[in-house]
């Protein structure tokens, strides 16, 4: 279900403050966050944000095509290890 248009997109306050501070001084450093639910807004373009996937922080470079998506969409939490092996030798 989409968010109402009369509401602004959700961005965690601590993340927004860090991005605004970096935009003011023009710095380029990695921002570490656990806020996977935050929406990517145009002020984030050009920054590298390390998003937590449950185990580690994955650095993601924000581009203009990512605006409107959530941060968690770019840090997968599950790793596919393959389907179960068909072990015919043990059945004999």
Curated annotation (Swiss-Prot):
Keywords recorded for this protein, A-Z: Chloroplast, Plastid, Ribonucleoprotein, Ribosomal protein, RNA-binding, rRNA-binding
Chief place where the protein resides: plastid
Molecular function GO labels: rRNA binding; structural constituent of ribosome
Keyword field contains Ribonucleoprotein: yes
Subcellular location: Plastid, Chloroplast
UniProt keyword annotation of Hydrolase present: no
SUPFAM superfamilies noted in UniProt: Ribosomal protein S19 (SSF54570)
PROSITE patterns: RIBOSOMAL_S19
Any single GO BP term: ribosomal small subunit assembly
Coiled-coil regions listed in the entry: none
Domain of life of the source: Eukaryota
Positions of transmembrane segments: none
CC terms in the record's Gene Ontology section: chloroplast; mitochondrial small ribosomal subunit
HAMAP family hit by this protein: Ribosomal_uS19
Functional note: Protein S19 forms a complex with S13 that binds strongly to the 16S ribosomal RNA.
Family: Belongs to the universal ribosomal protein uS19 family.
PANTHER family assigned to the protein according to its UniProt record, in alphabetical order: RIBOSOMAL PROTEIN S19P FAMILY MEMBER, SMALL RIBOSOMAL SUBUNIT PROTEIN US19M
Record's protein name: Small ribosomal subunit protein uS19c
UniProt organism field: Piper cenocladum (Ant piper)
């Amino acid at each position: 279900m989409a968010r109402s248009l009369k509401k602004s997109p959700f961005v965690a306050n601590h993340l927004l403050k860090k991005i605004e501070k970096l935009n003011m001084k023009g710095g380029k450093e990695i921002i570490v966050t656990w806020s996977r639910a935050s929406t990517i807004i145009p002020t984030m373009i050009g920054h590298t944000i390390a998003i937590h996937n449950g185990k580690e922080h994955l650095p993601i470079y924000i581009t203009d095509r990512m605006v409107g998506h959530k941060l968690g969409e770019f840090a997968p939490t599950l790793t596919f290890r393959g389907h179960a092996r068909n072990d015919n030798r043990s059945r004999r």
